[in-house]
Amino acid sequence: MNIRLLVVSKTDIPYIQEGIDVYAKRLKHYVNFDLEVIPALKDQKGASPDEIKEREAALILKRLEGADRIVLLDEHGKEHTSVGFSGYLQKQMNAGVRNLVFVVGGAFGFAPSVYAAAHDKISLSQMTFNHQMVRLFFVEQLYRAFTILHHEPYHNE
């Protein structure tokens, strides 16, 4: 399976990027993993949050393919425990999903067109996180899920 994390705008906080790099490297042991960054929009002055979401949506949708299984990281999505999330990944693999794409939107979230294209929504917490921090939290949880699936000692119950 190929897993891609599609994010809007680069991670500009160095310690967050370092953490992402650590877990992305570890993930390569288990799965083909790629982090794809959609460059930040230019000239957003005066644009409403809805206009920004629509512009970002066009960029997100352009990078998705028909065979992709699209999962939004969204505050209104289904919450999983770490073990539950590993089970979710196992179900995707058992179903023969080849390309699993997780999407982190910009600061204002997603436009309706992105919601319409998605197959699932997952929430990392009922709390709201900075969209850059979500990247690190998610990549770590992805790594944790694969260690659970491989019965490795990283995760403690």
Go through each PLM region and give its residues.
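S-adenosyl-L-methionine/SAH cofactor-binding core of RNA-modifying enzymes
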Residues: N32, P39-R98
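Loop/turn-to-beta-strand initiation segments
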Residues: N2, R98-F102
